[in-house]
C-alpha cells in the first residue's frame, strides 16, 4: 500500500499552480496545501489554500502541524534568501529548496559573480561597487556597452540595459542614489553587455548530482517584438530549438547526448551546472532544490561546437513562466524527484521527459508592469477543463464575495499547450487564451515566433543543401525587383523638370544645368537617411510618407547653400522586396521631389536577405542642386542680423532612438497605436510619422527677394548645434526662449524623459525646422514672402558680437 503524503507549496503564482498540478499526479500525494495561494484551489480537488500574512518558518511550521505536512516545496526566491529552509529544518520539516547560504547565488549578484570567477564558470567581465562616485568614475572610463544589476533581490526587475553613456549614468543613479530597487541597490554589479539568444536552463539537484531540464526561452518585455518595459515574463516555450539539437518534433538523438537535449546542453552541464553544484558544496553551501541558469548563447557561429555560452545570472528556484512549460513535459513523478533531492539519492532516479513542445502565453492586467486594477471578473475560466495538453495556470487571481474568480495581480493567467510540434503548441496556446477574457487583458502575440523562424531557416538550409541553387533561392527575387521598377516608373516621370535628359533605369542619370537655366553654377550635394523613424513606420505598416522625410533631409540641406535642388536619387535596401511596400515608399519619395521642384532620376533597390530581416528596410538619399557662383550662401552675416524661425511639422527625422526609448519604456504601457495623450484625434504613431517639412520652395522665394544672408537646417543637435554651423567666427546667436511655439509632442517627450530645456534644445528641433539669417531692413518683406508660401514665421533672435574674441567659434546664447 502506497503511503500518501501531504506537501505544502509556498507561493501564489502560475509557477506554484503548475507545481501543485504536477504534484497531484503522484500516487504518493494526498493533498497539497497552497500558501498563500490563489483562486486555483477552487478549480482543483485535494488542494487547500491557506492565507498567511507573513511567510516565515514559524508561520509555515504551524500550518504544517495543522494539516499534517511533512514536506515543503518553496516556489519564490525571497523566502529562500531569507532562510526559511534553515528555519523549517530546525523544526524537523523536510524542505525542497536551498539554504540561506546556498540561496546567495540569487540573493547577492556580487556573491554570484565572485563565485563564478572563483570556479571558472563563463560569465561577462564585471566590477562591483558600494560607492556611487567610484562606480560613476568606472562607468565613465569604459568604452563598451554595459549592464547594471542591483545586487539584491528586486523581483526580477533590478537589471538595467542602457543604450549609451548618458543612460548608463542615469541608471546608476536610479539604482544607488534614488533607490528605485530599495536596499537591493546598496551594492551594484557593472558587467559587460553580451549579445545573442537568452536561454533558461534549470536542473534538479541533491547537492551532489543533478538532472537537467529541457531548456526554455522566456519573453521578458511587455510588448511584441521585445519592446516596452521588462516584466516577470510574458510567455515561454520549451525546448528551445536554437540550443537543442532537434527539429520541429522536438526529437533528439539521445544516443549521442548524455543530457538527452544535445551537445550544447551537454556542454552547459559540464562547464556550468556541474561546476556550480560542486563549487557550492566545496564552499560549505550544498545546493538542494532547483538551480536556474540564465544563459546567453552567442550567435557568432552557426556550428554547434563554436557557440559561446555565458551565464547571465543564477536563480535559486524554478523560473516563472519557464516552470509552466517545463513541468508539462516531465514524465517522471515530481514528488519522487523532490524526495530524491531531499534524501540525497537523485543519481538513482531515471528522470524522463516528453519529446513534445510546450508553450505558455501570459494574460496580464492592463497597465502591467506598472500600476493595474484588481477585482475584475475573469470570464471563461471555469468553462475550461484542464487536460494534460491544455492547461490554464492561475497567478494573480482570487475569489470575491460573489464567488467569482477575479484578477488580483499583474500577471493573471498562463495559458499552456503541449503538442507534437512547436507550431501547433503555439497555435493551441493562443486558441486557449482566446477563450478567456477580463477587462483590459493584454498578452503578447509573438510568443515562440523566434523559434519558428529558427526552425524555418534550418528547414530551408536542409532543403537547399539537397538541390541545385538559383539566385531566387538565395532570397533575391529579380522579378519582384522588376515589378517595383515598373510601378515607380510613372511616379518618377511625374517629377521630370527642365534639365532632365535621361529616363529611369539606365546605368547613369544625366542632367543638363544649362537647359535648367544656370549660367555659372556651383553644384551642391546633400545625402542623408531617415534613421530609426523607419522602425516605427515598419511596425505600424505606414510606408507612404517616410519617403518625404528622406527627400526633405537632403534637399533642406542643399537649400541652406542657396541652391535649387535639381535631381534626387534614392537607395532602398531590404531583406525581401514586398512590391506594395517598396512602391509606397518610392511614391513618398516622388511626392517629396515634386513638392521641392527636383526630379527623381535614379536609384537602387537592393534585396539582401542576409543583411536585413523580412519586413525590414533602410533608406538613403542623394540630392544635387545648383547655385550661381555669385549667389552662394551664407554671405555677409553680421551683427544685428535677425533670426527668423520657420515652424517644424513635428519631430522631423532626428532623435528617434531617444523617442522610441521614451515611448517604449517610460510611457506607462502606451504603444504607437495608442491615442496621443496630447491630441485625441491622432495616435502616437501618426504624430511621430508626420513627415519632415519641406522648406525648399518657400526659402528659394525668400532668397530670390533679397536680404537672406544665411540659413540653418535644424536637425540632430537642435538649434544649439546646427545654427552656429553657418555663423562666422567672432559672432554669436542670441535666441529668445519663448519666442516660438514648442509643439505638444516635444512637451510630452520632455515630461517622459524629465528633460531639461537645455537638453531639449540640443537634441530635437523643438518646433523650429529652419532658421533664416536676415538683414534687419528686409525682415518684413521676407516674412510676408514666407507666409505667402504657408510658412509659420517666428522672430526668435539676432546675431551679436562675441564677448570673447573675434576668433572664437560661434555659439548659441539663450535668453
Swiss-Prot record:
Similarity section: In the N-terminal section; belongs to the GARS family. In the C-terminal section; belongs to the AIR synthase family.
Cysteine disulfide links: none
Organism expressing this protein natively: Dictyostelium discoideum (Social amoeba)
The protein's name in its UniProt record: Bifunctional purine biosynthetic protein purD
Matches recorded under PROSITE patterns: ATP_GRASP (PS50975)
Intracellular or extracellular location(s): Cytoplasm, Cytosol
Reactions performed catalytically: 5-phospho-beta-D-ribosylamine + glycine + ATP = N(1)-(5-phospho-beta-D-ribosyl)glycinamide + ADP + phosphate + H(+); 2-formamido-N(1)-(5-O-phospho-beta-D-ribosyl)acetamidine + ATP = 5-amino-1-(5-phospho-beta-D-ribosyl)imidazole + ADP + phosphate + H(+)
InterPro entries found in the cross-reference section: ATP-grasp (IPR011761), ATP_grasp_subdomain_1 (IPR013815), PreATP-grasp_dom_sf (IPR016185), PRibGlycinamid_synth_ATP-grasp (IPR020561), PRibGlycinamide_synth (IPR000115), PRibGlycinamide_synth_C-dom (IPR020560), PRibGlycinamide_synth_C_sf (IPR037123), PRibGlycinamide_synth_N (IPR020562)
Cofactor(s) the protein needs: Mg(2+); Mn(2+)
Residues that coordinate or bind Mg(2+): 313, 315
Gene Ontology biological process terms in this record: 'de novo' IMP biosynthetic process; adenine biosynthetic process; purine nucleotide biosynthetic process
Keyword terms: ATP-binding, Cytoplasm, Ligase, Magnesium, Manganese, Metal-binding, Multifunctional enzyme, Nucleotide-binding, Purine biosynthesis
NCBIfam families per UniProt: purD, purM
EC numbers on record: 6.3.4.13, 6.3.3.1
CC annotations in GO: cytosol
Keyword Hydrolase: no
Free-text comment on the cofactor: Binds no magnesium or manganese ion per subunit.
Keyword Glycosyltransferase carried by entry: no
PANTHER family with a match to the protein in the record: TRIFUNCTIONAL PURINE BIOSYNTHETIC PROTEIN ADENOSINE-3, TRIFUNCTIONAL PURINE BIOSYNTHETIC PROTEIN ADENOSINE-3-RELATED
Region AIRS, residue ranges: 469-801
Region described as GARS: spans on this chain: 6-452
Pathway info: Purine metabolism; IMP biosynthesis via de novo pathway; 5-amino-1-(5-phospho-D-ribosyl)imidazole from N(2)-formyl-N(1)-(5-phospho-D-ribosyl)glycinamide: step 2/2; Purine metabolism; IMP biosynthesis via de novo pathway; N(1)-(5-phospho-D-ribosyl)glycinamide from 5-phospho-alpha-D-ribose 1-diphosphate: step 2/2
Residues that bind ATP: 139-200
Function statement: Catalyzes the second and fifth step in the 'de novo' purine biosynthesis pathway; contains phosphoribosylamine--glycine ligase (GARS) and phosphoribosylformylglycinamidine cyclo-ligase (AIRS) activities.
Molecular functions (GO terms): ATP binding; metal ion binding; phosphoribosylamine-glycine ligase activity; phosphoribosylformylglycinamidine cyclo-ligase activity
Amino acid at each position: 500500500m502506497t503511503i500518501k503524503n501531504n506537501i505544502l507549496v509556498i507561493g501564489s503564482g502560475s509557477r506554484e499552480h503548475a507545481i501543485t498540478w504536477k504534484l497531484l499526479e503522484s500516487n504518493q500525494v494526498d493533498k497539497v496545501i497552497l500558501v498563500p495561494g490563489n483562486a486555483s484551489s477552487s478549480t482543483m480537488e485535494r488542494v487547500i489554500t491557506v492565507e498567511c500574512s507573513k511567510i516565515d518558518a514559524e508561520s509555515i511550521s504551524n500550518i504544517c502541524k495543522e494539516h499534517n505536512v511533512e514536506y515543503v516545496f518553496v516556489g519564490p526566491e525571497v523566502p529562500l534568501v531569507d532562510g526559511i529552509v534553515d528555519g523549517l529544518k530546525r523544526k524537523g520539516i523536510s524542505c525542497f529548496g536551498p539554504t540561506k547560504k546556498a540561496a546567495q547565488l540569487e540573493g547577492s549578484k556580487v556573491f554570484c559573480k565572485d563565485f563564478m570567477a572563483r570556479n571558472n564558470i563563463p560569465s561577462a567581465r564585471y566590477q562591483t561597487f558600494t560607492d556611487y562616485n567610484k562606480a560613476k568614475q568606472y562607468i565613465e572610463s569604459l568604452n563598451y556597452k554595459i549592464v547594471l544589476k542591483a545586487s539584491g533581490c528586486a523581483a526580477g526587475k533590478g537589471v538595467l540595459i542602457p543604450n549609451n553613456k548618458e543612460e548608463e549614468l542615469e541608471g546608476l543613479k536610479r539604482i544607488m542614489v534614488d533607490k528605485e530597487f530599495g536596499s537591493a541597490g546598496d551594492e551594484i554589479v557593472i558587467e559587460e553587455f553580451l549579445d545573442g539568444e537568452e536561454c533558461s536552463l534549470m536542473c534538479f539537484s541533491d547537492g551532489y548530482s543533478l538532472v537537467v531540464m529541457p531548456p526554455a526561452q522566456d519573453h521578458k518585455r511587455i510588448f511584441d517584438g521585445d519592446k516596452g518595459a521588462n516584466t516577470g515574463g510574458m510567455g515561454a516555450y520549451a525546448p528551445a530549438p536554437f540550443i537543442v539539437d532537434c527539429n520541429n518534433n522536438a526529437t533528439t538523438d539521445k544516443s549521442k547526448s548524455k543530457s538527452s537535449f544535445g551537445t550544447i546542453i551537454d556542454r552547459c552541464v559540464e562547464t556550468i551546472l556541474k561546476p556550480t553544484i560542486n563549487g557550492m558544496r566545496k564552499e560549505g553551501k550544498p545546493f538542494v532544490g532547483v538551480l536556474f541558469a540564465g544563459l546567453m548563447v552567442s550567435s557568432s557561429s552557426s556550428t554547434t561546437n563554436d557557440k559561446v555560452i555565458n551565464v547571465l545570472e543564477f536563480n535559486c528556484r524554478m523560473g516563472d513562466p519557464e516552470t509552466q512549460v517545463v513541468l508539462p513535459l516531465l514524465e517522471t513523478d515530481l514528488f519522487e524527484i523532490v524526495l530524491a533531492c531531499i534524501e540525497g539519492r537523485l543519481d538513482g532516479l531515471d528522470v524522463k521527459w516528453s519529446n513534445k513542445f510546450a508553450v505558455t502565453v501570459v494574460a496580464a492586467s492592463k497597465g502591467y508592469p506598472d500600476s493595474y486594477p484588481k477585482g475584475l471578473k475573469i470570464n471563461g475560466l471555469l468553462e475550461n477543463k484542464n487536460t494534460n495538453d491544455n492547461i490554464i495556470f492561475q497567478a494573480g487571481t482570487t475569489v470575491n464575495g460573489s464567488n467569482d474568480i477575479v484578477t488580483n495581480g499583474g500577471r493573471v493567467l498562463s495559458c499552456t499547450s503541449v503538442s507534437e510540434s512547436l507550431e501547433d503548441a503555439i497555435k493551441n496556446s493562443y486558441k486557449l487564451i482566446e477563450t478567456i477574457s477580463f477587462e483590459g487583458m493584454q498578452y503578447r502575440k509573438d510568443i515562440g515566433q523566434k523559434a519558428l523562424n529558427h526552425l524555418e531557416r534550418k528547414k530551408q538550409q536542409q532543403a537547399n543543401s539537397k538541390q541545385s541553387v538559383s539566385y531566387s533561392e538565395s532570397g533575391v527575387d529579380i522579378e519582384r525587383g522588376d515589378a517595383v521598377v515598373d510601378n515607380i516608373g510613372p511616379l518618377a516621370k511625374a517629377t521630370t523638370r527642365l534639365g532632365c535628359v535621361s529616363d529611369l533605369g539606365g546605368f547613369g542619370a544625366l542632367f543638363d544645368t544649362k537647359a535648367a537655366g544656370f549660367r555659372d553654377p556651383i553644384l551642391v550635394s546633400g545625402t542623408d537617411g531617415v534613421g530609426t523613424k523607419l522602425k516605427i513606420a515598419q511596425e505600424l505598416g505606414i510606408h507612404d510618407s517616410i519617403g518625404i522625410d528622406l527627400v526633405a533631409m537632403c534637399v533642406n540641406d542643399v537649400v541652406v547653400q542657396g541652391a535649387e535642388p535639381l535631381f534626387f536619387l534614392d537607395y532602398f535596401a531590404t531583406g525581401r522586396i514586398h512590391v506594395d511596400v517598396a512602391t509606397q515608399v518610392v511614391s513618398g519619395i516622388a511626392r517629396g521631389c515634386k513638392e521641392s521642384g527636383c526630379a527623381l532620376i535614379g536609384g537602387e533597390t537592393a534585396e539582401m536577405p542576409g543583411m536585413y530581416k523580412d519586413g525590414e528596410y533602410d533608406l538613403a538619399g542623394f540630392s544635387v542642386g545648383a547655385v550661381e557662383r555669385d549667389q552662394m550662401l551664407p554671405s555677409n552675416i553680421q551683427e544685428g542680423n535677425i533670426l527668423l524661425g520657420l515652424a517644424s511639422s513635428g519631430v522631423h527625422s532626428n532623435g528617434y532612438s531617444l523617442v522610441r526609448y521614451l515611448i517604449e519604456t517610460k510611457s506607462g504601457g502606451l504603444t504607437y497605436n495608442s491615442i496621443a495623450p496630447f491630441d485625441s484625434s491622432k495616435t502616437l504613431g501618426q504624430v511621430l510619422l508626420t513627415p519632415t517639412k519641406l522648406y525648399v520652395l518657400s526659402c528659394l522665394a525668400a532668397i530670390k527677394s533679397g536680404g537672406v544672408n544665411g540659413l540653418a537646417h535644424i536637425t540632430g543637435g537642435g538649434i544649439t548645434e546646427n545654427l552656429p554651423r553657418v555663423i562666422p567666427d567672432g559672432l554669436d546667436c542670441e535666441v529668445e526662449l519663448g519666442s516660438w511655439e514648442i509643439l505638444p509632442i516635444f512637451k510630452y517627450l520632455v515630461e517622459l524623459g524629465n528633460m531639461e530645456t537645455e537638453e531639449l534644445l540640443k537634441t530635437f528641433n523643438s518646433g523650429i525646422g529652419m532658421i533664416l539669417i536676415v538683414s534687419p531692413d528686409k525682415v518684413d518683406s521676407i516674412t510676408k514672402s514666407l507666409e505667402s508660401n504657408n510658412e509659420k514665421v517666428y522672430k526668435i533672435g539676432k546675431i551679436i558680437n562675441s564677448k570673447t574674441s573675434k576668433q572664437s567659434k560661434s555659439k548659441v546664447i539663450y535668453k
